[in-house]
Each structure stands twice: as structure tokens, then as C-alpha cells.
Amino acid sequence: MKILVTGADGYIGRHVIAELLDRGCEVIASDLRKEGIDPRARVAEADIFSEDQELYEKLGSPDVLIHLAWRNGFDHYNKSHVDDLPKHYRFLAAMMD
């Protein structure tokens, strides 16, 4: 089973990926930053907010998605949180099609 984790280099993402890998899962990691991603994971580079029709394939055709990506994560009052909601929805819908 292939599991895609977005926000892979974030605090939660790094811990989720490590646990999945320790349990023997095949992990595909996606993030704008790559420095802290566990080297055992396969890194997929793609803009999750793009309207690319082949985004699912570019992200490794995962069986499971754990979507943890969130721009400006700890800046709780950042306008980007509201502005990005439609993009998150579009990404999730694209991954289900």
C-alpha cells in the first residue's frame, strides 16, 4: 500500500512518516521543503495547489492520502488559511477522482 503524506517536512509530517516507515509502509512524501524528509521515503515533487490533470500520477498514484500540508501553519491568523481553503478542497477532490 502506497501512502502519500503532504506536509512531509513539517513537525507532524516528519513524525507520521517515520512511524509509517518503521511499520513497513511504502511512503511517498511531498512538501515544498525537502531537507527534513526521512531518506527512506520516496519524494514526489508536485505543486499540490496546481490544477494539473495528472497530479495524482505525479504524486505516485497513492492508495492512501494523509494531507498535512498547510501554508503558514503556526501563524493562526494568516489570511492564507482562508484563501487556500478552495485549493485544499480542489487538491483533495483531484486525489479522489
Regions inferred by a protein language model and the residue ranges of each:
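Short, conserved active-site loop motifs that form the nucleotide-linked donor/cofactor pocket
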Residues: 41-42
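Conserved Rossmann-fold NAD(P)-dependent oxidoreductase catalytic core, especially the SDR/UDP-sugar
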Residues: 90-97
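Conserved glycine-rich Rossmann-like NAD(P)H-binding loop of the short-chain dehydrogenase/reductase
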Residues: 25-36
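NAD(P)H-binding glycine-rich loop region in Rossmannoid oxidoreductase-like domains
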Residues: 36, 48-90
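Long, low-complexity, intrinsically disordered polar/charged segments
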Residues: 1-5, 59-62
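Conserved residues in the N-terminal Rossmann fold of short-chain dehydrogenase/reductase
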Residues: 45
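N-terminal Rossmann NAD(P)H-binding glycine-rich loop of SDR-like oxidoreductase domains
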Residues: 3-23
